[in-house]
Amino acid sequence: MADDWESAADSEVVIRPTAAASVNKWEGEDEDEDIKDSWEDEEEKKDEEKPTKTEAPAKPKPNKALKAKLEQQARLEEEAEAQRVASLSPAEKLAEKLRLQKIQEASDLKHAQEAFGVTSTCGGLDAFNPESKEEFKEFGATLSWKVAQFRESEHFPQFVEDLVRSLCVNLSAADIKKVKMNVEILHSEKLKLEKANAKKPAGKGKGKVTLRTENDDIDGYQKYGNDFTEDYDDFM
């Protein structure tokens, strides 16, 4: 009987299949999204790293009409100036020549000041502070050049005489003697030159004889008036 029960119990045992592990159908979806996002980020970075092409500004085309107009205006001004000069009287032409000469002298003075380091026109000669022998030569050359601009005045000879006297007051007797000797030598040379020029017949095409001093080499910027300023360079 006991064997029958055991057999019946064994026959009633049912072996059920093991339940399959639950599978999440959304599993791995997040990973796909992460991969997709990383691709998009890389694409954005590549787009940012690409150099942006800047278009070069278009070069302005030359205005041919304006250029031609300016050239025509300049040509008309030159023609008008030529006609004006041609219509001047001899006296007016001389005055015009003197005016242009003064302009040139002013330009030469400006270049001389720049060469000597005098950049401020307000300071003028006061801007000089000579200490060495060469600096005093430069100062004297500039001073004599400036003074010589007034050589056409009838008061110029008296002015020079007074200037020399006032300068010599500050010298010793020995130094004044040296100045006197230089002036006498200069006076003698001037007499010889004046006599030589007076004896030469006019119209021979030879230039006037002038006195040359060492300052002509030192002060090459003096385009005008060397024959006047050299009279005073040796003792100024």
UniProtKB/Swiss-Prot annotation:
GO CC annotation terms, alphabetical: eukaryotic 43S preinitiation complex; eukaryotic 48S preinitiation complex; eukaryotic translation initiation factor 3 complex
Asked if Cytoplasm is a keyword of the record, the answer is: yes
Per the record, which residues fall in region Disordered?
Answer: 1-88
Q: Name one GO molecular function term.
A: translation initiation factor activity
Record-linked Gene3D superfamilies: Eukaryotic translation initiation factor 3 like domains
Indicate, by first and last residue, each region the UniProt record lists as having compositional bias (Basic and acidic residues). 47-58, 68-77
- Keyword annotations: Cytoplasm, Initiation factor, Protein biosynthesis
Q: Where is the composition biased (Acidic residues)?
A: 28-46
From what superkingdom does this record's organism come? Answer: Eukaryota
Where in the cell does this protein reside?
A: Cytoplasm
One BP term from GO: formation of cytoplasmic translation initiation complex
* InterPro entries per UniProt: eIF3-like_dom_sf, eIF3j
Q: List the disulfide bonds.
A: none
Residue ranges annotated as coiled coil are none
Can you state the subunit structure given in the record?
Component of the eukaryotic translation initiation factor 3 (eIF-3) complex. The eIF-3 complex interacts with pix.
Function summary: Component of the eukaryotic translation initiation factor 3 (eIF-3) complex, which is involved in protein synthesis of a specialized repertoire of mRNAs and, together with other initiation factors, stimulates binding of mRNA and methionyl-tRNAi to the 40S ribosome. The eIF-3 complex specifically targets and initiates translation of a subset of mRNAs involved in cell proliferation.
Spell out the protein name for this chain. Answer: Eukaryotic translation initiation factor 3 subunit J
